[in-house]
């Protein structure tokens, strides 16, 4: 029976992990849908960003009523009390700044969970503003490389205010300042360029490179923070292979680079 017990415990842990992942993915998709509906209306036929968010939600088997509530929150037809968007700031070991975004109905629980994790791993949860100045918001758009040529995309995006256009792993990545995010998105839509994903992300203005053992320790803390039920994304100033470590999101390169 001991073998069966261990096997069941292993299966149960895997299911719990899968359930946590699904819950976090759905939370992020709900935010995407709500944001798209708020900015472009609740009709997916007339709102490219909403249509794309709904497609991703269906791929993740997101419940229909959950999708409908997110759309109605975005259009203002539904107001749900209890959950609110939150941000937290702190330092991981070795001077790595950490910026956390989340959504919670129990702020005391969220703060306690974060404070315990930071403390247990040699870091500390700071006050508002303690590390926010080390990050700036950037807009990010992803377009399949086979959907257009780089020159056409570059001309459309830069004319609308984009900062740069890069290609990585078969995808064009357009980076904008926060204020140009909406204008660039509209320009891409009008040009008929299919955006696969878009988001406002946080880019560090400076990064920290660490020795492998130090880097792994910091990454372990960040992964545990990202696993918390109320956390949707985590940004850091830790650089790994030329890219700032961020979980729950795609992150822009260091600001100004």
Swiss-Prot record:
One GO MF term attached to the UniProt entry: DNA binding
Predominant location category: cytoplasm
Transmembrane segments: none
Region described as Disordered: spans on this chain: 1-25
GO biological process, one term: regulation of DNA-templated transcription
Keyword Ribonucleoprotein: no
Domain of life, per lineage: Bacteria
Pfam family, one: Transcrip_reg
Record keywords, A-Z: Cytoplasm, DNA-binding, Transcription, Transcription regulation
Keyword Transcription in record: yes
Compartment(s) of residence: Cytoplasm
Compositional bias annotation for Basic residues: 1-15
GO cellular component: cytosol
PANTHER family: TRANSCRIPTIONAL REGULATORY PROTEIN YEBC-RELATED, TRANSLATIONAL ACTIVATOR OF CYTOCHROME C OXIDASE 1
Family affiliation: Belongs to the TACO1 family.
Protein name: Probable transcriptional regulatory protein SRU_2667
């Amino acid at each position: 029976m001991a073998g069966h017990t261990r096997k069941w415990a292993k299966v149960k842990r895997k299911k719990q992990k899968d359930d946590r992942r699904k819950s976090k993915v759905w939370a992020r998709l709900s935010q995407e849908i709500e944001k798209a509906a708020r900015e472009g209306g609740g009709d997916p036929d007339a709102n490219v960003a909403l249509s794309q968010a709904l497609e991703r939600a269906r791929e993740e088997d997101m419940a229909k009523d959950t999708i409908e509530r997110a759309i109605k929150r975005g259009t203002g037809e539904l107001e749900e009390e209890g959950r609110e968007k939150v941000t937290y700031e702190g330092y991981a070991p070795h001077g790595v700044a950490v910026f956390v975004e989340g959504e919670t109905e129990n702020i005391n629980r969220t703060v306690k969970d974060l404070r315990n994790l930071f403390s247990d791993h040699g870091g500390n949860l700071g006050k508002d503003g303690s590390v926010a100045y080390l990050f700036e918001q950037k807009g990010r758009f992803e377009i399949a490389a086979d959907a257009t040529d780089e020159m056409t995309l570059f001309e459309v995006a830069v004319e609308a205010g984009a900062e740069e256009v890069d290609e990585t792993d078969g995808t064009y990545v357009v980076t904008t300042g926060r204020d140009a995010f909406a204008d660039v998105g509209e320009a891409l839509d009008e040009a008929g360029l299919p955006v696969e994903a878009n988001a406002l992300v946080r880019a560090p203005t400076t990064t920290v490179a660490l020795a492998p053992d130090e880097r792994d320790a910091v990454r372990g803390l960040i992964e545990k923070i990202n696993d918390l039920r109320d956390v949707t994304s985590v940004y850091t100033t830790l650089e790994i292979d030329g890219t700032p470590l961020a979980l729950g999101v795609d992150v822009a390169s260091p600001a100004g680079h």
